């Protein structure tokens, strides 16, 4: 999100100060790095949104943008209404806001409501295909328009043509923004950045310098980064942040596996982390323990988090066989064709998979697929089959989307100092957000 200025029309002293701020020096895991913050085309410069406002550079007026005819037909909960009022107050004052509410709070529906309130054509920026589809479904569910000639929402690809300008909401992947015509991008008065901690990565944050809205809304349950690019948040979005942290009773069972992974070292003397994860994922006894935990809790709906597809495939096959007895078709005199049509109890979400059977009792997925842009409100149990530390609160929130469930987490702890240190980090997260830790015995 940026402001567009003609450098020849800027006071020389202001321009000099802008140039001094054009490069951000960051510490990237102990390594100094320079990040270029502006975009210059001939005499036109694009300045990060909040930085421009700090220099009193003009924000585009409302009448520059097309209005939308969309009305919100949903209903916000009381806690969402409070956040809405706070966001409107901040937007009226600063034109930008970060909404950092826990997973399952309802940031999507809240942002749609805000866009309808602001009544300007809205661009939604995401980083994953699954997020594009979820936003479109939500907009169609919660919005209606009297003008049937203009689509309520369109998904924009790099091949999209000019007719896609004629919509109330547009959804685009951040990587495609630089490929679009500038005139198209300048038609959006409101921009929503979903999962902003992902968009602010080194490869994608500069896409924000191509859009020039009046209002800017950033969404994330984890609005921070650990690679030094955390410093970009106030530069683009300002310092105003609405925070709602998860605080809900949940039970964590620590499962001591007794498994001791083989530790290998590279030529640089550092531990080979990938080799350790491979050993962890392929250990048969450890994987059988996971199957047994699922088998012992048939009333639960599991989310099993893995980092290696081969582990997920093995677990899916064994859990289907051991926990749901796939040979029961023989007892019921079902034919082979009938057995093939029978729905499976275990679904997977990894690799090229973008969808899964929502009637499943067990969902196995990689952290890349389930960390963001994932919505399955039947889940009540998380089983950590792989090591996870960063943005862990995102995963906990996946099993707390419904108020009428008692969330349970099974955290597998292996015999390794590094893995145990990571468990200690997760333990802090559990206790901070209402967790009660117990030991689990098979």
Curated annotation (Swiss-Prot):
Domain annotation Helicase ATP-binding: ranges: 88-241
GO molecular function: ATP binding; DNA binding; helicase activity; hydrolase activity
Top-level EC class as recorded in UniProt: hydrolase
InterPro entries (alphabetical): ATP-dep_DNA_Helicase, Helicase/UvrB_N, Helicase_ATP-bd, P-loop_NTPase
Binding positions for ATP per the UniProt entry: 101-108
Alphabetically ordered keywords of this record: ATP-binding, Helicase, Hydrolase, Nucleotide-binding
SMART domains: DEXDc
EC number: 3.6.4.-
Motif (DEAH box) on chain: 194-197
Family indicated by similarity: Belongs to the DEAD box helicase family. DEAH subfamily.
UniProt protein name: Putative helicase 161L
Organism: Invertebrate iridescent virus 6
